[in-house]
Swiss-Prot record:
Cleaved signal peptide residues: 1-31
BP-aspect Gene Ontology terms: lipid metabolic process
InterPro entries in the record: HAT_RTT109-like, PLC-like_Pdiesterase_TIM-brl
Keywords, comma-separated and alphabetical: Signal
Protein name: Altered inheritance of mitochondria protein 6
Gene label: AIM6
Length: 419
């Protein structure tokens, strides 16, 4: 048995050695953490440097290509932006944080600075894209579409193609469309709405005109089609007006119909209702409970907010000529290709076999297009076959060159941009 003083010495030596070992491990761990933190900082700086000057399709491509790096390093995650945190997808969340973060450039500049406007394209089922709304704007598309459903006890409008994919918490009309649009329009309209000091480089502060979301063409209005899906269209309309569109109306951002002169006054954003919308003018111009009027003049008692204005337009049936004169004044008329072919004693099946519209079909459909234009309506044909690609492209050409359709309805923005 060892003497006590030797045991004590050995124990002290053991404690000293273990202490040195833990100290070395801790030092290595801290060093690795410091290196990792420094690497992340450098990577974040590289991403921010790369993004300078990028916009449009190049910006979209950069985010899709570098998403793992951007997400893993949380490049923009800690930025404080007015729209809060989204949880739509990894790509959407990262892109959203970049757009609405502390970067000094205005949002419209980031999105559309070098973008060529494509005025004849409608982004069908826009909400299916990886970046709803933003992707269409980066391609220069001037018309987008969102399908909406009444959810959460009729207090919210969720964006979805059908009831199976409804997500009212993360994919509502305000999260995907109205909140981003309102923020963008606030950035470029009026000194009281400026969040960025250099936004004045884009627009003249003394200009009283409302400016839109396209950097190179600030006078162009973005058309937003809202497709009513729920059976209760009256409640859908009431919620749309009072909750989602009211902030735009208060800032004069919406195109409207002057109910006294029947004149359409263009704004940065044009709202068109499609699908199962209410058709009665008594519903469209209903007076909400909180609406007030500053006068007892009968002429001031028109419109949903009793301001003599109607802020939405109906997507009128292109294939029903006799109704166009009877329905409310509007800006758009649409029909499916199948509906028009039926009117022309043909069918979609025959067209698919042939691969293009015949001369007789073109002549017949052209009459419907011309009739709509007599009422100053833009036109759109939906339900165009997407396959084979050669048929789709041929039909795109026939719509544009032979029929003079105003909006080519498509799900493929990349191909139509190169068309």
């Amino acid at each position: 048995m060892l003497p006590p003083f030797i045991v004590a010495g050995l124990f002290s030596s053991y404690i000293l050695i273990m202490g040195l070992m833990f100290s070395q491990i801790s030092h290595v761990s801290n060093s690795n953490a410091s290196v990792s933190s420094a690497a992340k900082s450098l990577e974040s700086l590289r991403v921010k440097r790369d993004l300078i000057g990028l916009s449009g399709k190049e910006l979209l491509k950069y985010f899709k290509t570098n998403l793992p790096t951007i997400s893993s390093n949380s490049v923009f995650a800690n930025l404080d932006h007015p729209l809060g945190v989204t949880k739509v997808s990894q790509l959407y969340d990262a892109f959203h944080d970049y757009l609405f973060g502390e970067d000094q450039r205005p949002i419209v500049q980031k999105l559309t600075q070098d973008v060529t406007i494509i005025p004849n394209v409608h982004s069908h089922n826009d909400y299916w894209r990886s970046l709803p709304l933003f992707e269409a704007l980066m391609y220069g598309v001037t018309s987008v579409e969102a399908d909406v459903w009444l959810t959460e006890n009729n207090t919210s409008l969720s964006v979805s193609h059908d009831t199976r994919h409804i997500d009212p918490k993360h994919k509502s009309l305000d999260i995907l469309y109205t909140q981003p649009l309102l923020e963008m329009l606030n950035h470029v309209n009026g000194p009281q709405n400026y969040h960025h000091s250099d936004v004045k480089e884009i627009f003249d502060e003394q200009d009283n005109k409302m400016h839109g979301v396209f950097y190179g063409d600030s006078s162009r209005s973005l058309q937003l089609l809202i497709d009513f899906k729920s059976e209760n269209n009256e409640k859908t309309y009431e919620l749309l007006m009072s909750k989602y569109l009211k902030p735009f109306i208060q800032r004069n951002y919406l195109t409207y119909l002057d109910l006294t002169t029947n004149e359409i006054i263009r704004g940065p954003l044009t709202i068109v209702l499609t699908g199962n919308y209410p058709i009665k003018e008594s519903i469209l111009d209903y007076e909400s409970e909180d609406a007030t009027s500053e006068s007892n003049n009968h002429e001031l008692n028109k419109g949903y907010f009793r301001d003599n204005k109607r802020y939405v337009f109906l997507d009128l049936p292109l294939h029903k000529q006799q109704l166009l004169a009877k329905l409310p004044t509007s800006v758009l008329s649409s029909a499916s290709l199948s509906q028009l072919l039926t009117k022309c004693q043909s069918s979609l099946m025959l067209l698919k076999l042939r691969g293009h519209l015949s001369d007789d079909e073109l002549k017949c459909i052209k009459k419907y297009i011309n009739h709509a234009k007599e009422y100053h309506l833009a036109t759109r044909i939906w339900g165009i076959p997407d396959w084979p690609i050669s048929t789709r492209n041929r039909l795109w050409k026939q719509q544009f060159y032979d029929l003079n359709v105003d909006y080519i309805n498509t799900d493929d923005l990349k191909d139509i941009a190169n068309f």
